[in-house]
């Protein structure tokens, strides 16, 4: 699993770079997981409500899978094993969440700021 720094690099490679060659499912999954974490953070901080870890992880896994689908379709990545990339993205998203909030009782936007890598 990747930490925030490497996951952010994967996100940038997938979402911003004009890739000439083929992306691996690991890079795609890492980028999708990072973007899912960013989307989750943005939404939860806007709402300002604490949520249980199980719910947060469930939401993140759904967002990560949706991001993989979106990327495969919009970037013409038909050669990617979509289901493998989704599973990897879900695990990576859970890992990022655990790294940032796993030591807390629940996700509470009032108790801890977002990871600095997601400030863009």
Question: Whereabouts are the PLM-identified features?
Answer:
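N-terminal leader-region detector that preferentially activates on the first domain or presequence
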Residues: 1-27, 35-57, 67-120
């Amino acid at each position: 699993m990747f930490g925030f720094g490497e996951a952010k690099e994967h996100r940038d490679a997938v979402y911003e770079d004009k890739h000439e060659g083929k992306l691996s499912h690991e890079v795609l999954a890492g980028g999708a997981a990072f973007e899912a974490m960013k989307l989750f953070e943005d939404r939860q901080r806007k709402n300002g409500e604490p949520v249980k870890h199980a719910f947060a992880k469930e939401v993140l896994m759904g967002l990560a899978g949706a991001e993989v689908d979106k990327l495969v379709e919009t970037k013409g990545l038909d050669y990617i094993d979509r289901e493998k990339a989704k599973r990897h993205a879900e695990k990576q998203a859970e890992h990022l969440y655990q790294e940032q909030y796993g030591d807390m009782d629940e996700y509470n936007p009032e108790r801890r700021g977002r990871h600095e890598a997601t400030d863009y």
